[in-house]
Regions:
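Solvent-exposed alpha-helical segments within well-ordered globular domains of core cellular machineries
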Residues: 10-14, 28-32, 43, 47, ...
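Conserved, well-folded catalytic cores of nucleic-acid-processing
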Residues: 15, 19, 37, 52-55, ...
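Long C-terminal interaction/binding lobes of large macromolecular proteins
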Residues: 130-200
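Catalytic cores of large soluble enzymes that bind and process phosphate-bearing ligands
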Residues: 4, 37, 41, 117-121, ...
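Flexible, active-site-adjacent loop/turn segments at secondary-structure boundaries
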Residues: 17, 72, 91-94, 104-107, ...
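Cys/His-rich Zn2+-binding cysteine-cluster or related metal-binding knuckle/ribbon modules and their
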Residues: 2-9, 18, 31-93
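Extended interfacial segments that mediate partner engagement and assembly in macromolecular machines
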Residues: 27, 76-142
């Protein structure tokens, strides 16, 4: 049987290991780093986590993260309110914003359709998207979901759903590798994918 640390240190390692992208060894490294870090540094991390949990919420309009709703994008009158870019997660909004190529609005689904993980369309922020589309100002919806199986399934579902409207539905152009994530795409590739989007 593998040796485990006692009490608090093992609970801390386990907590870090539960985070996405952090395995057992990485979790152990972080835990021991914090154990040896100055108290101020550890307290700064604790305060940052507490502050995020207390202050950060989801925008009532688009579903992006914010401290006040509506979020800065939805509240900005200089943005193009006739275009909505649909993304999977808030981190995808930041990736697209870094391109400086897009000045429209966003809609965050909060995930993708994934029958293996029991995620159905009703579990996503789709009903609010349909409500937003009743606004006659919206002329185009860009489906900017990751080019993997789940993203493609969600794109297909939304395409069929939106085909019943007069709204132009487009998706990102090729350039993003199949199975890749928008989050990891460089700004140039993502900018070109936005500029070259095509009808669905």
């Amino acid at each position: 049987m593998a040796l485990a640390y006692d009490g608090a240190i093992q609970r801390l390692i386990d907590a870090f290991a539960n985070l996405p992208g952090i395995g057992p060894k990485g979790a152990q490294r972080i835990a021991f780093y914090l154990l040896n870090a100055p108290d101020e540094e550890s307290q700064a991390l604790i305060d940052a986590i507490t502050e995020v949990k207390e202050k950060v919420r989801f925008c009532d309009i688009c579903g992006n993260v914010c401290e006040t709703s509506p979020c800065p994008v939805c509240a900005d009158p200089r943005r193009d309110h006739s275009v909505i870019c649909v993304v999977e997660e808030p981190k995808d909004v930041m990736s697209i914003e870094r391109t400086r190529e897009y000045r429209g609005m966003y809609h965050v689904l909060g995930g993708v359709i994934n029958p293996m993980a029991n995620v159905q369309p009703s579990d996503l922020n789709i009903a609010k998207l349909i409500e937003r589309l009743k606004d006659s100002e919206v002329k185009e919806v860009i489906l900017a979901l990751n080019p993997n199986v789940e993203g493609e399934a969600t794109t297909s579902f939304l395409s069929q759903l939106l085909s019943q409207t007069d709204i132009k539905v487009t998706r990102l152009a090729s350039g993003l590798p199949v199975g890749g994530d928008i989050e990891y795409a460089d700004e140039i590739t993502l900018g070109r994918a936005l500029a070259g989007r095509r009808a669905v």
